[in-house]
């Protein structure tokens, strides 16, 4: 089977959690592995009316048969992790690489007393950045040093590669978005490491030739939480009028919003080597699309928007989110 890497194409909050949850349930991969920075970013999953907001556990946990892995590139907060294990009930299916750096209370305190991080850059204050910085100095504690994590220890790179060798499916979940990348984003208004597809693969121990697809998640409008530039930013009143007001999963802060940006989308396709696009929340720019699960039933306005995205990016829009639930989705991956 294949290896599909899911990453964000804007500033995070594109709906990666929904896409990963759908793919985990639809494609039934053997493994869902999480890359990214750490608990500084949250993914929201809604199924059967129940909402899960996750910062550590892979969003594919809804597939009760898959193995859930956290790669060595991800910083782990044991407290956040324990809470999410209890909420999701995945204790027996979870594996954490022993090389994951561990976020300690002092990391969180360092970020929360930093005026530069909190006030100027809009950090979430999760301790992830301080942990990553200490890892670069080679002084950070790792998961193998934490007794309460001992039973979860797993050689994540070996597991994901061996699964692929056996013909099993692997789904890799990225976090945040292309323009929050430390290398390719709006520095210094960015996260503490690269979060593009190549980095997410490295986070879980996958070489580039193991990847079958890179699914770039784009929302039908652009949002950004915290500080930093947002091209085409709308006034708060206009955001409310359009029904685009959202709130950060981790911080609860209002997200600023702007119309879909084709320039950003094209560059994100290039930077991530995207093979396909997943478009979310089309129902918020075309209300008649709400809940639709067939492309033919979409209103003309929505189809024209999708066709323009495909034309401008030269990539197919294969998944289209039409509502908040995981299965509010049009799946065009196997169309003739």
Predicted region positions:
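Non-transmembrane, aqueous-exposed alpha-helical and coiled segments at domain scale
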Residues: 1-336
């Amino acid at each position: 089977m294949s290896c599909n890497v899911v990453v964000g194409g804007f500033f995070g909050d594109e709906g990666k959690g929904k896409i990963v949850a759908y793919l985990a349930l639809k494609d039934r991969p053997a493994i869902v592995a999480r890359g990214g920075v750490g608990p500084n970013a949250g993914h929201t999953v809604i199924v059967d009316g129940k909402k899960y907001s996750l910062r550590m556990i892979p969003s594919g946990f809804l597939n009760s048969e898959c193995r859930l892995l956290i790669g060595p590139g991800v910083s782990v907060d044991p407290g956040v992790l324990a809470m999410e294990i209890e909420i999701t009930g995945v204790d027996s299916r979870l594996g954490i690489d022993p090389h994951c750096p561990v976020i300690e209370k002092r990391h969180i305190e360092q970020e929360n007393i930093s005026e530069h991080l909190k006030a100027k850059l809009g950090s979430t204050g999760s301790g992830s950045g301080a942990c990553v910085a200490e890892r670069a100095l080679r002084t950070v504690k790792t998961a193998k040093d934490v007794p309460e994590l001992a039973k979860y220890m797993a050689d994540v790179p070996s597991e994901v590669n061996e699964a692929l060798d056996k013909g099993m499916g692997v789904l890799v979940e990225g976090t945040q978005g292309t323009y929050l990348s430390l290398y390719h984003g709006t520095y210094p208004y960015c996260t503490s490491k690269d979060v593009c597809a190549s980095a997410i693969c490295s986070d879980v121990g996958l070489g580039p030739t193991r990847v079958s697809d890179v699914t770039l998640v784009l929302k039908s409008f652009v949002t950004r939480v915290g500080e930093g530039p947002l091209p085409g930013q709308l006034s708060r009143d206009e955001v409310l009028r359009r029904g685009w007001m959202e709130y950060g999963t981790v911080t609860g802060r209002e997200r600023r919003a702007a119309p879909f940006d084709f320039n950003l989308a094209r560059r994100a396709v290039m930077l991530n080597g995207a093979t396909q696009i997943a478009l979310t929340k089309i129902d918020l720019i075309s209300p008649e699309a709400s809940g639709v699960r067939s492309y033919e039933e979409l209103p003309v306005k929505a189809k024209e928007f999708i066709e323009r995205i495909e034309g401008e990016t030269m990539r197919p829009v294969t998944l289209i989110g039409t509502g908040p639930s995981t299965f509010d989705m049009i799946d065009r991956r196997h169309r003739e």
